[in-house]
């Protein structure tokens, strides 16, 4: 169903009010004096196709956010919810600054491991952020954010099958000036953001320094640790230099550092119910949460109510640290009056640590601890030419990245499962003899550096390790030609070659003292190489200077790779996957109506995925048992419709509406639908609903300003909504998410060079939780369970700038 009937009346009524009110206002204006000042919607210039052009002239589904960055309650990228249809930008709370991105139902299968590439690119000043850690950028000194929906493979390359979030910061102005923003709020929120511009050599060199510091005491009481969580401690500082030695050359160099010592933002509630608290499932595919988890039974760390908790109880604090050093260069050289060379390059070096209490209970049951090092380098060289009736962009792109990850699972979990092996010398020696590669102990290996097993008080840990290098290069071309003043043709193509070299250690059991020794009994050493072509063609018809229709066909691909979240060599070798491909047909209508007071954009799309990468259940051909596999498992069709409307109702009032409808369906998908029946039957599962594809998104709100004294009062309010979503691959009841709502608002007073703003977030104080069940079956309780603490409660703050 492309259009959600539940919201049809609301949307139709809203648009009718927009247009009807517009006609009334236009009629009233005609009766005013001829010299009355006109008003309307400001034009926004974007670089969605690598060249500067009006957003309304771009035959791409794009939302450009500019003024809202300064006047609305956008603290960071996660607050863009509701500003663009079919777009969800959330926090992935198990990584520092981690992003959970979803555009038109396209989202990463998982974001916790650097071996997985995301299908949506986050760019900052032309640099692709290659890991999800640190992608939730803080909002200050941002010139604009462009959200491009649909495959953008021709100009932006690999891993853009869902779209692109393009963030552009301001350049040094070359004049003395400063902006300062200080914020205080609930739960000890303290923020300080500053940017200072200054000339160095007049007309030749300009500079800018910037800094952001954020602290927060946390909002969720932890009754086990006796404090609030998660605490936030974030810093970003750096400088930019703008070189303009002559009229032809320009270069901006930015050097910066991020230091995020915050707790992991995605806190969990315990979902370890005691016997009989939850209702027994009727679906035989569902884990029986009415039976107590092992964490509850063995340690008494039980949850005794179905009500969403108002506290956390994990016994290990979710400590984290992310340090990032980055260098970005943007340079251009004017060749002729209408052509130039452009270079964009940069490096990013990330060091990441995190530990989280995986069972989310007061029991010392299981923790996961990870150390990551990640480096990336990219270079892009473009030739751009714009004439009266054509635009040409051609270029070369190079990418290299490398990561290393150590991770350890600890707590009492492995002692519960393999304590007899760890503490019995004969069994420990036998386990060392098989090295986890075959025999009765496979896939478990035991540390060859420890003789006689572990002591009774030792914590049994499992050690894992992986490292990967990725390198790709691409050549691309995009050309647009105006046949006449009505019709334009667009065609583009990109050729990409990429290889990945992956090494992972055979997991083994050891103790805490030796958890970083890397004493692996064996390694998986894997290599893959691909080359792909990503084309795009389109036609644009200009009805008049304010209205256009376009139709386009574009393709993109998401890189193949290796499933890094495995424990043994055999599974690493099995879980290699090829690229997935998107083929998107899009029809759009863009318009400025009512004398430039109503901007109305409509889009319909049909995005077909082939070889979609997915984790599914299949029969192992060797052991004849069922197990989870990661591979190119499905073909999926995403269809939808989008409305974007911005209406200047009066000189002082603007209304906006953003609605996206999505219908996702499998065209082909095979898996074991009932993993607990013991049959291991892999069958057609195309009747299931693809996960993480919300039925709709909605954002509606207003901005009102009025002159008061020597200044101006401005009120901004936004309501956003996300529809029903399946978070479970098998559409289990436990994974059915009913959707979420959010209301935020702010009121500010602006005068000359200062302002004060009062803001509120989650004003309806909505709460929800989404459970994750580990282990168990229809006839047995889980090993342990947790649920994501969905939203921070209602909060207020005040900002001075």
How would you describe each model-predicted region?
Residues 391-393, 485-489, 606-608, 631-730, ...:
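Gram-negative outer-membrane beta-barrel transporters
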Residues 226, 232-393, 399-404, 599-601:
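Outer-membrane beta-barrel domain signature, strongest for Gram-negative TonB-dependent receptors
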Residues 242-246, 383-384, 395-399, 466-608, ...:
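Structural signature of Gram-negative outer-membrane beta-barrels, strongest in the C-terminal barrel
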Residues 220-228, 265-313, 357-368, 408-465, ...:
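Solvent-exposed loop segments that connect transmembrane elements
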Residues 39-175, 587:
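Acidic, small-polar-rich N-terminal luminal/periplasmic segments of exported/outer-membrane proteins
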Residues 118-119, 131, 140-143, 149, ...:
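Outer-membrane beta-barrel translocator/receptor signature
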Residues 330-334, 340-346, 351-356, 542, ...:
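Membrane-embedded beta-barrel scaffold of Gram-negative outer-membrane proteins
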Residues 416, 655, 720-728, 749-801:
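C-terminal beta-signal and adjacent terminal beta-strands/loops
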């Amino acid at each position: 169903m492309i259009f959600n009937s539940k919201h049809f009346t609301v949307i139709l009524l809203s648009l009718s009010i927009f247009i009807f009110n517009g006609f009334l206002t236009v009629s009233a204006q005609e009766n005013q004096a001829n010299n009355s000042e006109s008003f309307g919607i400001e034009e926004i210039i974007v670089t969605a196709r690598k060249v500067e052009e009006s957003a309304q002239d771009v035959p791409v589904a794009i939302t450009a956010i500019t003024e809202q960055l300064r006047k609305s309650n956008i603290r960071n990228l996660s607050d863009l919810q509701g500003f663009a249809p079919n777009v969800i930008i959330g926090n992935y709370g198990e990584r520092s600054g981690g992003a959970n991105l979803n555009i038109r139902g396209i989202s990463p299968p998982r974001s916790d491991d650097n071996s997985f590439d995301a299908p949506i690119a986050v760019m900052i000043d032309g640099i692709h952020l290659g890991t999800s850690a640190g992608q939730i950028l803080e909002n200050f000194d941002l010139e604009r954010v462009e959200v491009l929906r649909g495959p953008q493979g021709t100009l932006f390359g690999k891993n853009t099958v869902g779209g692109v979030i393009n963030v552009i910061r301001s350049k040094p102005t070359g004049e003395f000036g400063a902006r300062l923003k200080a914020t205080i709020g609930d739960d000890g929120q303290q923020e300080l953001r500053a940017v200072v511009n200054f000339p160095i050599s007049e007309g030749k060199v300009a500079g800018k320094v910037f800094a952001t510091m954020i602290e927060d005491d946390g909002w969720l009481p932890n009754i086990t640790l006796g404090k609030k969580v998660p605490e936030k401690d974030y810093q970003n500082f750096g400088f930019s230099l703008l070189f303009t030695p002559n009229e032809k050359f320009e270069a901006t160099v930015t050097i910066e550092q991020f230091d995020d010592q915050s707790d992991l933002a995605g806190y969990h509630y315990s979902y370890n119910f005691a016997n009989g608290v939850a209702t027994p499932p009727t679906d035989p595919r569902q884990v029986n949460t009415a039976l107590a988890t092992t964490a509850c039974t063995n340690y008494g760390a039980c949850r005794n109510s179905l009500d969403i908790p108002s506290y956390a109880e994990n016994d290990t604090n979710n400590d984290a640290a992310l340090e990032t050093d980055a260098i970005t260069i943007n340079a251009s050289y004017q060749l002729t009056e209408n052509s130039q060379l452009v270079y964009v390059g940069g490096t990013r070096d990330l060091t990441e640590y995190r530990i989280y209490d995986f069972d989310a209970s007061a029991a010392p049951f299981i923790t996961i601890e990870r150390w990551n090092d990640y480096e990336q380098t990219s270079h892009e060289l473009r030739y751009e030419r714009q004439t009266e009736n054509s635009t040409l962009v051609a270029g070369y792109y190079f990418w290299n990245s490398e990561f290393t990850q150590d991770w350890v699972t600890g707590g009492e979990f492995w002692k519960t499962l393999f304590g007899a092996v760890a503490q019995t010398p004969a069994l420990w020696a036998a386990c060392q003899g098989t090295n986890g590669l075959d025999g009765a102990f496979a896939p478990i290996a035991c540390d060859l550096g420890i003789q006689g097993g572990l002591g009774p008080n030792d914590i049994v840990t499992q050690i894992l390790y992986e490292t990967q290098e990725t390198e790709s290069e691409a050549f691309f071309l995009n050309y647009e030609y105006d046949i006449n003043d009505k019709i334009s043709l667009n065609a583009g193509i990109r050729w990409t070659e990429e290889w990945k070299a992956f090494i992972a250690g055979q997991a083994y059991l050891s103790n805490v003292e030796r958890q970083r020794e890397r004493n692996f009994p064996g390694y998986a050493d894997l290599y893959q190489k691909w080359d792909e072509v990503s084309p795009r063609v389109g036609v644009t018809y200009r009805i008049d200077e304010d209205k256009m229709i376009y139709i386009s066909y574009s393709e993109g691909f998401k890189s193949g790779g290796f499933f890094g979240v495995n424990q043994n060599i055999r599974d690493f070798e099995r879980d290699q996957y090829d690229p997935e491909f998107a083929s998107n047909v899009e029809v759009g209508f863009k318009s400025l109506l009512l004398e430039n007071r109503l901007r109305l954009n409509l889009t319909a799309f049909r995005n077909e995925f082939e070889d979609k990468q997915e984790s599914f259940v299949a029969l192992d051909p060797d052991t004849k048992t069922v197990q989870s596999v990661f591979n190119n498992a499905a073909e999926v069709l995403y269809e939808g419709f989008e409305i974007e409307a911005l209406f200047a109702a009066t000189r002082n009032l603007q209304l906006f509406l953003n609605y996206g409808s999505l219908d996702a369906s499998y065209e082909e998908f095979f898996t074991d639908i009932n993993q607990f029946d013991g049959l291991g039957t892999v069958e057609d599962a195309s009747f299931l609903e693809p996960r993480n594809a919300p039925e709709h998104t909605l954002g509606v709100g207003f901005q009102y300003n009025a002159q008061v004294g020597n200044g101006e009062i401005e009120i901004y309010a936004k309501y956003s909504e996300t529809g029903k979503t399946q978070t479970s691959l098998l559409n289990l009841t436990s994974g059915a998410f009913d959707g979420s709502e959010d209301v935020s608002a702010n009121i500010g007073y602006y005068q000359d060079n200062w302002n004060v703003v009062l803001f509120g977030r989650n004003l309806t104080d909505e709460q929800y939780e989404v459970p994750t069940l580990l282990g168990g079956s229809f006839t047995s309780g889980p090993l342990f369970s947790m649920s994501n603490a969905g939203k921070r409660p209602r909060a207020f703050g005040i900002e001075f700038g």
